[in-house]
Amino acid sequence: MATYVMSDLHGDYNGYKSILKQITFNESDTLYINGDVLDRGSYGLKILLDMMLKPNIYPIFGNHEYAAYQCLKFLMEEVTEDNIEKLDAGFLEGLLEWQSIGGQTTIDEFHKLNHDERQSILDYLEEFSLFETITVAGNDFVIVHAGLDNFNKSRPLEDYELHELIFRSPDYDKIYFDDKYLVTGHLPTRVIDKNPKPDHIYIKNNHIALDCGAGFGGQVGCICLDNFEEFYSKDI
């Protein structure tokens, strides 16, 4: 019975399954997936379809899920004059921006699903949380996809807006909480300044950064919060 977190799978189904095998994931365990399951790689929706069968996997919203949800909702609709009118400049700009960050692979995969599978994907995305706060083995953790933009120690987590949680990474040189760990993804650890091990989990200043670059030729990383053991989908 253990608690794990992984993040930024970006369609790497084999990496996802490799981690589950390594940790011998079972019904007594808990796994948090900290956003950006989708895009860049080809099998993000395949991962979601597997995740939704496992009630002990808890998904957290990332910026790629946000972009996908806005556009996939429209792709589910029958094309009529009324909803064609919804294609304003803002929507088209959002679609193009999503495609520019790897969304085309998700669109292609979505088109291959049947109607029920597509609807189940949209329903599942609506269940994603914005953050999680948990205690494991006496340590407290805040799990959020990108960070806590406009951070203030006295500000309740519930007061943060969506855009403050999924777009901007924290300052990894700064301690945000003296008494808990801030667990994030979003920013590949290879670009964290002075990180001695690119594409590996970065732990410093009460931060745990989990994006090991799966969307950019790196790997999927996973950490066990009970003992801080690390697992990787590749031997980099």
Tell what function each PLM region has:
Residues 1-50:
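N-terminal active-site segment of His-dependent metallophosphoesterases
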Residues 5, 31-33, 59-60, 142, ...:
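Residue-level marker for buried hydrophobic side chains located in beta-strands
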Residues 8, 36, 51, 62-63, ...:
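Divalent metal-coordination and catalytic microenvironments
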Residues 10-14, 39-42, 66-69, 185-194, ...:
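Active-site environment of divalent metal-dependent phosphoester hydrolases
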Residues 17-18, 45-46, 72-73, 155-156, ...:
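Short amphipathic alpha-helical segments
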Residues 26-28, 54-56, 139, 178-179:
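A general structural motif
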Residues 44-48, 53-132:
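Active-site neighborhood of divalent metal-dependent phosphoester bond hydrolases
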Residues 97-209, 213-218, 228-229, 233-234:
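Acidic, His/Gly-enriched loop-helix segments that form or flank divalent-metal centers
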